């Protein structure tokens, strides 16, 4: 309904995706595309200022931090493009160094975990194991490409993972639930020299 005086590329009525990272595009970190480390923005939405799950949002550096949404893109699909999907891809899959032939474990099958499942498949891992307490989420994970699913209520997760891969553990463990128990679980099932993201 309103754009600030400094905004030149976005006009009232435009459909946009709000990047979860605000970027000034002028600082040293932005110049080398480390936008999450922007000296003037970065991860400020939801931390330093109000977040974006609201009807009205103030977006710093709007010309750089808003992406126009083409009319032919479904708004429900676009919702994932602003936070869950890029977070899962960068922080989970890329930082987890997923490579072809790897074994990947994802702790948590919520929006970030499912997004990690989808984006990990871009790297052709040999196996993707998704772990969650919710059977409906595990069923969906299988439909979306998980090779294996584990419900921790069914027994020792480490033993179940070892039966799927080998006793050394997985190449990459992605923690997508945000609780201490799943962080510990990831440490228990990753192989020596593997990655936890």
Locate predicted features.
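Mid-domain Rossmann-like dinucleotide-binding core that forms the NAD(H)/NADP(H) cofactor-binding site
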Residues: 71-155, 159, 193
């Amino acid at each position: 309904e309103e754009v600030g005086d400094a905004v030149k590329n976005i006009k009232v009525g435009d459909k946009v995706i709000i990047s979860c990272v605000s970027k000034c595009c002028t600082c040293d970190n932005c110049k080398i595309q480390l936008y999450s480390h922007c000296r003037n923005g970065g991860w400020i939405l939801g931390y330093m200022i109000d977040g974006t799950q609201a009807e009205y949002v103030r977006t710093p550096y709007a010309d750089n931090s808003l992406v126009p949404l083409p009319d032919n893109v479904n708004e429900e699909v676009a919702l994932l493009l602003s936070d869950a999907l890029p977070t899962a891809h960068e922080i989970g899959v890329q930082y987890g160094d997923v490579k072809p032939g790897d074994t990947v474990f994802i702790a948590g099958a919520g929006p970030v975990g499912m997004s990690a499942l989808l984006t990990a498949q871009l790297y052709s891992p040999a196996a993707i194991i998704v772990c969650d307490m919710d059977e409906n989420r595990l069923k969906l994970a299988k439909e979306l490409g998980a090779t294996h699913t584990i419900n921790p209520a069914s027994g020792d997760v480490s033993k179940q993972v070892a039966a799927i891969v080998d006793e050394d553990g997985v190449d990459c463990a992605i923690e997508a639930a945000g609780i201490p128990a799943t962080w510990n679980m990831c440490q228990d099932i990753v192989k020596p020299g593997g990655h936890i993201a």
